[in-house]
Structure formats: C-alpha cells, structure tokens
Curated annotation (Swiss-Prot):
One of its GO terms (molecular function) is metal ion binding. The keyword ATP-binding does not apply. It holds the Pfam family RlmN_N. It catalyses: adenosine(2503) in 23S rRNA + 2 reduced [2Fe-2S]-[ferredoxin] + 2 S-adenosyl-L-methionine = 2-methyladenosine(2503) in 23S rRNA + 5'-deoxyadenosine + L-methionine + 2 oxidized [2Fe-2S]-[ferredoxin] + S-adenosyl-L-homocysteine; adenosine(37) in tRNA + 2 reduced [2Fe-2S]-[ferredoxin] + 2 S-adenosyl-L-methionine = 2-methyladenosine(37) in tRNA + 5'-deoxyadenosine + L-methionine + 2 oxidized [2Fe-2S]-[ferredoxin] + S-adenosyl-L-homocysteine. The gene is rlmN. The lineage of its organism: Bacteria, Pseudomonadati, Pseudomonadota, Gammaproteobacteria, Cardiobacteriales. Reaction proceeds by a ping-pong mechanism involving intermediate methylation of a conserved cysteine residue. Belongs to the radical SAM superfamily. RlmN family. Disulfide bonds join 106-342. Specifically methylates position 2 of adenine 2503 in 23S rRNA and position 2 of adenine 37 in tRNAs. m2A2503 modification seems to play a crucial role in the proofreading step occurring at the peptidyl transferase center and thus would serve to optimize ribosomal fidelity. GO terms for cellular component: cytoplasm. This is Dual-specificity RNA methyltransferase RlmN. [4Fe-4S] cluster binds at residues 113, 117, 120.
Amino acid sequence: MTEKINLFDYTPKALADWFVAQGEQPFRAKQVLKWLYHERVYDFERMTDLSKKLRAMLSEKACVILPQVIADKTARDGTRKWVFQYACTNSIEAVFIPEDDRGTLCISSQAGCALACPFCSTARAGFNRNLTTGEIVVQVWLAKELVHCERNGNSRLITNVVLMGMGEPLINFNQVLPATEIFMSDWGFGLSKRRVTLSTSGVVPAIHKLREVTDLSLAVSLHAPNDELRNKIVPINQRYGLKALIEACALYAENNKQHGGITWEYVMLKGVNDTLEHAQQLADLLRNVPGKINLIPFNEFPNSPFQCSSWEDIVRFQQFLQKAGYIATIRKTRGDDIDAACGQLVGRVNDRIRRERQFQGFKA
C-alpha cells in the first residue's frame, strides 16, 4: 500500500500537481487548503464542498500528522512555550511571544543543532535530524489552534513567524523553503514577507541561494566583530568567514531594502565581546550593509562558561553604535523563567551528537 501523504508537507502548487496526478482538477488543492489553513479543519468528512468520492480518495491517500503536545508552559510575562513530540520520539520547542501590537511565534527547523555555539543551550543537546516541511509548518498551525482556543477565538494573534528556534534553518534549506512559502501563501497562513524572518548563523552558500528564490526577512546570528573571536563562539565561521558572510548579506540586503535590510543579532557576553573596542569593530564591519543591530542579553543556563554582560555595559555598547549611525536595540528577555528565552530551547534530542568538549575548553 502506498504511504499516505502529509498535507502539511505540500505547497499549494505541489498539492495541485498531486491532485492532477490523481486524475483530479488542480483547483481541488485550494479547496482543501482553505479547509486546512483557514477553517482549521483536517477531517476530510467535514470538508462539505468536496464530493463523497473525493473525500474517500483523500482518506485513502492523504492525512494530516499532528505532533503530541507534551508540555505547555506560560511564563510570568505571558510568553508561552510548547514542547511538541513527533512520532520518532524527538521533541522540539516553539515559543509564542505576545505583545500589544503583535504576536510572534518562534519555531524550530531541526531536532537539535549541529553548529555547537558554546553560548547556546540547544547546541549542548546535540543534533539528530532535520525536520520535514510538514513538521515545521505544523508548529504554526498547532500554535494558532492552541492560542485560538484560549483567546476568545482570535486566530489573528500570531502575526509574525521567526525561524529562530532549535536548529540552523539554512542547513535544512530544502524543507524550510517550502515551509516559508506556505507561511506566505494566501492559501496557507497569508503572512507578508516582512512578517516571516529566517535566522542563520552564516551558511553563506545558502544565503546566496535564498536570495535567488525569495526576499523574506533575514536575521544573522553574528555575535562577534572579528574572525578570531567568531571562530571560537560561532564555529561555522571557521568554514565561512566574516568577509564572505558580509558580502553575501550585502547582496541579500539589496533585494530586501523594503524590509529594512539585515537584522544583526549580537549576544552580549561578559568580558568576551562587549567592550567599546568590539563595538567599534562591529560598526566598521557593518558599515556598508543596511540593517539594524539587535543586542541580546545572554540567557544563562546550567554549566555555561559565560555570563551576561552588565546592563551598564550593554547600554554603553548600544549608545556607541547609535552614535556611529546605527539602529541598535536591546532585545527584551521574554520567558526566561520557563526556559523559553533566546538560546534556552532544548526539547529532547535522541541519538544526538554530543558537543561537550566545545563547552569544557572555551577560553575568550
């Protein structure tokens, strides 16, 4: 028997092609996707504008795979974290951050992460595998459902999606790209390009490839203003150095001017990357690339070799960048009391690749 397809894996075009292969009209895809994404209905028998024959065919050949919600926590500040478990027993985490004028959902692209950045708790958990397109998309679908049920039916509360959870999205390019297409499709979640952000640690070839097919918002986990330091705290820099990264981002920003350019993420680590000398190096490095700098207070976790910079040092760093002509903001820490803040997402990663030595021997 042929394995059933998971509808969450399919973009509108891919699903239309699938219907044609079944001897059906391509417009059936939009009918089904409207039920799935707009009405949040995945029981084919409830798709009342489909014929009985078509519903029977869908029941035989297609399905919707939902993960199990094994944890649902709400922080003091209203941030909400879910742990989703897939059939393979790996679990990943997604975080909803409500604000007065928006609701941001942070989702994962991999079970774990192989990049071994020593300031990130996710990296310590190791890496198992890439998530499928459907496993990425369903995080948004299920989060909308869970928020909808508790917020008087207001499904518009999730206004932004950021691929900043577990994993490096651009290593999982072939699964992430269709997911972003579904996020932005009118027959999917209908988000605008400026409301979908992909965060990368700097997979340079994939940034070039991404530029050729989309112009969604791009964030770069920079964290250091020179190669010597970045080689230590963002190890992928040993493969793709700052010169190549900045050049790739400058080209991407040319396609992305209407979205404000690149968002540069910079975690503030006490005594490591937080001096005014580092700020000057950062200002020089980013001089010709439009964008903004987001300073992130480090969120500590057990046995971490790092501490967060003092608030005074973070503000001093910000003010230096602002005087140098940059838009520089300090990210407000959200959800740290439930381990939902930046760098704290772990989930459960089975058959993982351990990275302990990366943490034990760090020296700034």
